[in-house]
Amino acid sequence: MKILNLKQSILALALGFSAFASQAQTAHRCGTDAFSKEFIEKHPELKLNIENLENSLNSMDVNSLPKNRAGNYIIPIVFHVIHNYGPENISEAQIKDAVRILNEDYQKRNADTNLIHPTFKPLIANVGFEFRLATIDPQGNCTNGIDRIASHRTYYGDETSKLNPWSRNRYFNIWVIAGFEEAGLLAYALKPSGAQFSPEGDGVIVWHRAVGSIGTAANAGYSDITLTHEIGHSMNLDHLWGSTNDPKVKCGDDNVTDTPNTEGHEFCDSISLMTDTVCKGTSDNTAGSQGKLEMLQNYMEYSFCPNNAFTNGQKDRMINAINSSTAQRSELFTPTTHTLTGVLDGQVADCNPEADFNAARRFACLGNASGLNVNITYEDFSYKNTINSRDWTFVDGTPAISTTTKPVVYYTTKGWKAATLKASTNATKFGTLTQSDYVYISDPSDKNPSNENTSFEDPNDYARWPIFNYFNNPFTWKYYDAGNVPSGWRALMFNGFDSRPFPQNATNVPFKDIDDIMTPSYNATGLASGFVSFKLASSSTAGNISQINDSLIISYSINCGSTWVELKSLTGSALINNGSQTTPFYPAANTTWSTVSIPMKAAAANANVYFRLRHVGGKYSNNLFIDNFMVGNAPTAVEKVQDGQIGVSLVPNPATNNAAVVINTPSNENVNIVVTDLVGKVIYTTTVSTIANQSSAYQLPSNVFNTKGIYMVTVANKIAKTTQKLIIQ
């Protein structure tokens, strides 16, 4: 199974983009107009070319084309299932059911044609398209026409989710995902005129619950003709109301003579009342041979009536498109294509299985950790053929071998562990996958000391902080050793800057990518009023703070990673403290290092508590650095100080309206606390007395902070002065 095969053209920003939205409680929407406008704004030099292509397609003489030739247009297809081992990883049976529906719809074999309004029955067309799953992939290898890819991009479907496209002149690409970033969408496609300039994004991207009629699509409340509708767009069909406005706006035309003008429909009105429409009697309702009736049952409507027909005029338009060189459509059905993709009559895929597995939990403790859940559950996700037997091997595991679908394993030695699966159809057809450093087993007795900084200067610290790059991409935690950090030379780093060249950086972007790093165990007994604190330096490539949408989530576990409880989520100005830059951010002499101090929860004050730092990628991520991680009574930076110095920390930080200044001085003395806003206006000042080498907290009055924002807190004695940033959320 592939993880992050990076191919994509940035030109796929959606010219000719068409979106089909869900019918349940949500108005149907199409993204054609908005995305076309956005594309033209970014690429105005292409506007005339696109218009010329559209006009050329519309003016083709269909009578000169072999629309009535013997046999169908056989089109090879591939389904790219983008998933994270959830329900979106739909079965081969569900995909084959979707292909069945496509072929019935495009060949007028669907059983519900008898429900079509009598007026329109003479117009219903057999388009003559036949879709077949490829049996040979672009490298000449055996395939069942299903390409499975594990990626975080499954959850936020857009052009950057169209991973590993196969050559569009040989295969029609369909991407299946868990959901779209924009709520309510079922699918979208590119029309040929737009796809001409976006070969890597040409095809359909669709929500898994709108694929076929079984599996996750069974009783889903969505139409099983979603793919039929979207492929219509790919073959140059517009919605019946046109491509320049949403439905229910005004009467429009799709440039097909035998589909009546309509304003479009978002739900199924009574078919018997199709003449009772807004378009009745208006000047808009003049085109179309069928007068004032509206064709609610057309595949290119949103009515879900059910939709069950293309017209002869729509067929002509699609035949024009598939015989055109625009977007290489005319190459999809050639004898060469059929041979190279393995869709000739009688060709059936019988491939070696592709072994794949997953463990939802990848971090646990030693098997002798008393009273703790230490089990790792593996699950077989092999594909490409029927799996009749499995052979698992677990290094240092108990059991060490297994033949079940979901083996449960624990480990009695610590460190990274490998796992191997051999998935077999028979003795000669099998696939094997080994994943090294797949799970990490921690020894809860190997504890980090409380009230001491982990500075990462000792290389031994690195091995005890396991890093999980779940999707094996460039965006990951790593260890940094190039200096300019509070502890001296080394720190933790999250590599968030996307340094990949075009076109690789136009797909599989870091937005919503999840990466974890776990701490060793801490004995936090007696620290119910303590803190988790660390030094933070970070930047963003965003132009303004409202665009910052990455986050750092700090959680704890008292059961060896079986469950995690969130302590704090940092985002926006609470996370980014070194402004914006379009180049990679690294610490320098003038870098701002903020102290993040997070109050412990009472439930975390446990003799065996772990902490997890989870980075969730944003659209404008840059690099992030962490140093001096500590779990203790006092936050980082208020440990024992030298003569003349002042140790200061703000807790919590960020805060709502209640924050305290924790101060440590080397002698009994008076110190001044001054709070200013960002323009330097003093909004609070006081003098407090400290006790030598003892951390003391001084509460700031809540009425000091009347508005959310950033404030500067300065603590000074006769010798030294320290200023820190306080964020009020």
Positions of predicted regions on the chain:
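C-terminal outer-membrane/trafficking sorting elements
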Residues: 20, 24, 389, 641-651, ...
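Primarily auto-inhibitory N-terminal propeptides
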Residues: 25-106
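Extracellular carbohydrate recognition
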Residues: 510-515, 544-547, 616-634
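Extracellular glycan-recognition surfaces and repeat-rich motifs
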Residues: 449-507, 511-513, 572-580, 593-594, ...
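Short beta-strands within extracellular/lumenal beta-sheet-rich domains
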Residues: 507-527, 531-533, 594-597
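Extracellular/lumenal mature domains of secreted and surface-exposed proteins
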Residues: 343-452
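Residue-level detector of functionally pivotal "anchor" positions at catalytic/ligand-binding pockets or at interdomain
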Residues: 340-360, 442-455, 510-512, 631-651, ...
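Extracellular (secreted or membrane-anchored) zinc-dependent metallopeptidases
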Residues: 71, 77-87, 92-135, 148-356
